[in-house]
């Protein structure tokens, strides 16, 4: 397995797909990285030379990926919570942040239902 940005990428897949295993690199970014490194998208990872791997690593080192990106995202969320913005409050309460309806759905964000017992009349 080739190791890029601290992640073991699968050898049997095409390079453009394998690069998406790195957090912060999707299909589009992977295509741009390969274009800049001068590597064909159809090449399998096992067929890459050390020189090509080095070029890919150099291009990816310029990007914010893995730990740095995760840290930046968490700091952004922490900042929203500290300034008390609407989005920060939604993050703190564990509710949807982007305006989705939360009366009936939003189960992914809210977690499993907590049933409330009925009062006897």
UniProtKB/Swiss-Prot annotation:
Keywords: Ribonucleoprotein, Ribosomal protein, RNA-binding, rRNA-binding, tRNA-binding. Pfam families: Ribosomal_S13. GO terms for molecular function: rRNA binding; structural constituent of ribosome; tRNA binding. InterPro entries: Rbsml_uS13_C, Ribosomal_uS13, Ribosomal_uS13-like_H2TH, Ribosomal_uS13_bac-type, Ribosomal_uS13_CS. The keyword Aminoacyl-tRNA synthetase does not apply. GO terms for biological process: translation. SUPFAM superfamilies: S13-like H2TH domain. GO terms for cellular component: cytosol; small ribosomal subunit. Residues 106-121 have a biased composition (Basic residues). Residues 93-121 are annotated as: Disordered. The keyword Ribosomal protein applies. HAMAP family: Ribosomal_uS13 (MF_01315). Located at the top of the head of the 30S subunit, it contacts several helices of the 16S rRNA. In the 70S ribosome it contacts the 23S rRNA (bridge B1a) and protein L5 of the 50S subunit (bridge B1b), connecting the 2 subunits; these bridges are implicated in subunit movement. Contacts the tRNAs in the A and P-sites. NCBIfam families: uS13_bact. Part of the 30S ribosomal subunit. Forms a loose heterodimer with protein S19. Forms two bridges to the 50S subunit in the 70S ribosome. Belongs to the universal ribosomal protein uS13 family. This is Small ribosomal subunit protein uS13. The gene is rpsM.
């Amino acid at each position: 397995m080739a190791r890029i940005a601290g992640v073991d990428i699968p050898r049997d897949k095409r390079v453009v797909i394998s690069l998406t295993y790195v957090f912060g690199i999707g299909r589009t970014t992977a295509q741009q990285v390969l274009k800049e490194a001068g590597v064909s998208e159809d090449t399998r990872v096992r067929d890459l030379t050390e020189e090509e791997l080095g070029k890919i690593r150099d291009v990816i080192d310029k990007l914010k990926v893995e730990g740095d990106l995760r840290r930046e995202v968490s700091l952004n969320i922490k900042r929203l919570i500290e300034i008390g913005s609407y989005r920060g409050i939604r993050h703190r309460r564990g509710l949807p942040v982007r305006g989705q309806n939360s009366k009936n759905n939003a189960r992914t964000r809210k977690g499993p239902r907590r049933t409330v017992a009925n009062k006897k009349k």
